[in-house]
């Protein structure tokens, strides 16, 4: 699998076949941030307060919207307004994992109506290609007005100890991404997947974005099996965007923590591309 990770985001944005990837890179360049904050809080007030305070320093906010005890229209209206105010994208970490007919309803309907507000979603590919096809068809339907601003990350690897997202599963993730490049933005993985074999030929302009979870300045794990990487180690292994949660939102000063992740993440990115960012 090819990698364009040595190129600056500005170059990748200008050549990228996926419109949401272009926007993502442009946001990152404008803000000099490749940080995704995982806002795993449980009330709308906490979520919106965190988004407003950290918004200037992040490229993406990642939500688990179903853990909010008071989810409602004010949640989404507030989050959309803050995304516009601070120029960040919204990533709903739903991890879709069901048959195609079910995930279409989960994505586009129900109480959460995720397709209406989340720029980025993710899925596991245990159900095989049909899950990617179903989500792509939903987002790219002719009567859906936000299709060019919606994209999918395939959960190709996980950072938890003993994860089974390896081997053939990871190879299948690459296969399906290559079949739906206009909708699949990239991967959630622990590294660039350049060495992963695939049965599908890569397009000449292939450029999948890599998000790496479990990034923490302390580089320690937790008692539930989470294994952390530092911003430098994650980006050195091929991450384009680093996902940090507790290292930011449980810090004594979350704003100062977000600034530290922004600085370290961006410096690591600049080192990787030889300081060629604009």
Swiss-Prot record:
Gene3D superfamilies: Aldolase class I (3.20.20.70). Pathway: Pyrimidine metabolism; UMP biosynthesis via de novo pathway; UMP from orotate: step 2/2. The active site is at residue 95. One of its GO terms (molecular function) is orotidine-5'-phosphate decarboxylase activity. SUPFAM superfamilies: Ribulose-phoshate binding barrel. Signal peptide: none annotated. It catalyses: orotidine 5'-phosphate + H(+) = UMP + CO2. Substrate binds at residues 40, 62-64, 93-102, 228, 246. Keywords: Decarboxylase, Lyase, Pyrimidine biosynthesis. GO terms for cellular component: cytosol. NCBIfam families: pyrF (TIGR01740). Belongs to the OMP decarboxylase family. This is Orotidine 5'-phosphate decarboxylase. It comes from Passalora fulva (Tomato leaf mold).
């Amino acid at each position: 699998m090819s990698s364009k990770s040595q190129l600056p985001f500005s170059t990748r944005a200008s050549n990228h076949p996926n419109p949401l990837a272009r926007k993502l890179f442009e946001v990152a360049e404008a803000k000099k941030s490749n940080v995704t904050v995982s806002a795993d809080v449980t009330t709308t007030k906490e979520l919106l307060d965190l988004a407003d305070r950290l918004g200037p320093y992040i490229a993406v906010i990642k939500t688990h919207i179903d853990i909010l005890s008071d989810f409602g229209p004010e949640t989404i209206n507030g989050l959309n307004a803050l995304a516009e105010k601070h120029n960040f994208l919204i990533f709903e970490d739903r991890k879709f994992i069901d048959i195609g007919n079910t995930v279409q309803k989960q994505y586009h309907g129900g109480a959460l109506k995720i397709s209406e507000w989340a720029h980025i979603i993710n899925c596991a590919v245990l159900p095989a290609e049909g899950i990617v096809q179903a989500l792509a068809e939903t987002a790219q339907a002719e009567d859906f007005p936000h299709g060019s601003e919606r994209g999918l990350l395939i959960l190709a690897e996980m950072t938890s100890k003993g994860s089974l997202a390896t081997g053939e599963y990871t190879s299948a993730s690459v296969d399906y991404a290559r079949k739906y490049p206009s909708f699949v933005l990239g991967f959630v993985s622990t590294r660039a997947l350049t060495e992963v074999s695939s049965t599908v030929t890569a397009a000449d302009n292939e450029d999948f974005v890599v998000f790496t979870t479990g990034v923490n300045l302390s580089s320690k794990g937790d008692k539930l099996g989470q294994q952390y990487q530092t911003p430098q180690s994650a980006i050195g292994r091929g991450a384009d965007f680093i996902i940090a949660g507790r290292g930011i939102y449980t810090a004594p000063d979350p704003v100062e923590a977000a600034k530290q992740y922004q600085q370290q993440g961006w410096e690591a990115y600049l080192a990787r591309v030889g300081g060629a960012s604009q």
